[in-house]
């Protein structure tokens, strides 16, 4: 899980979602998981 100020999809399988007011990227590649901090 990477915590960064701006989250962007890295590959075509990355999805940008909102969970509890936080913007997150989920992907089948675990390295692409991101959360907005």
Curated annotation (Swiss-Prot):
Membrane-spanning intervals of the chain: none
* Cellular component terms (Gene Ontology): cytoplasm; ribonucleoprotein complex; ribosome
Q: Quote the InterPro entries the UniProt record gives.
A: Ribosomal_bL36, Ribosomal_bL36_sp
GO MF term set: structural constituent of ribosome
A Pfam family that this protein carries is Ribosomal_L36
A Gene Ontology biological process noted in the UniProt record is: translation
User: Where is the signal peptide, in residue numbers?
Assistant: none
Q: At the top level of its lineage, which domain of life is listed?
A: Bacteria
Q: Which UniProt keywords apply?
A: Ribonucleoprotein, Ribosomal protein
Name the PANTHER family on file: 50S RIBOSOMAL PROTEIN L36, CHLOROPLASTIC (PTHR42888), LARGE RIBOSOMAL SUBUNIT PROTEIN BL36C (PTHR42888:SF1)
Question: What does the sequence similarity comment in the record state about its family?
Answer: Belongs to the bacterial ribosomal protein bL36 family.
| UniProt-recorded name of the protein | Large ribosomal subunit protein bL36
Q: Which organism is it from?
A: Geobacillus stearothermophilus (Bacillus stearothermophilus)
Recall the taxonomic lineage recorded for the source organism: Bacteria, Bacillati, Bacillota, Bacilli, Bacillales
């Amino acid at each position: 899980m990477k915590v960064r100020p701006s989250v962007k999809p890295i590959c075509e399988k990355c999805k940008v979602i909102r969970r509890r007011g936080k913007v997150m990227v989920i992907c089948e590649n675990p390295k692409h998981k991101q959360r907005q901090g």
